[in-house]
Amino acid sequence: MTEKIKNKNQKIITYSDSGVNIDEGNKLVSQISSITKSTSINGTTAEIGGFGGLFDLKKSGFKDPILVSSTDGVGTKLQLAIETKSYFNIGIDLVAMCANDVLAQGALPLFFMDYYATGRLNRKIALEVIKGIAEGCKQS
């Protein structure tokens, strides 16, 4: 994918022009790779940076498995995190919401698919959220 695209007026714009800082994103990935790796269980085969997750059910030890997954959000608790500048716990809570939905189906949480979206990357905040997500995965 090219870093430069043309808008309808044929003006070339870059990711940077639209507020995307690729260098900051790469620095964040470097900071969190060991954190995310610490959450791996038998069956986890994906590495950080890919655009999908891999889970080997044979390695997980289940017989005749059925996958159960959940996507959820933290809702208005996000506003509390912003107001208190406390971002670690929002990561834990995010995983807990999804893990509880999986558990309610009688299943075991095996993996967590994250999506971190922001208007502008604040690496310090992102790092705290992702540390919380990792802790939530360990607790689940």
Question: For each predicted feature, which ranges?
Answer:
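Glycine-rich phosphate/pyrophosphate-binding loop regions near the starts of catalytic domains
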Residues: Q31-S140
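Charge-biased, low-complexity intrinsically disordered regions
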Residues: I12-I13, D17-S18, I22-N26, G119
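Short, basic, low-complexity termini and linkers enriched in Ser/Thr/Gly/Pro
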Residues: I5-Q10
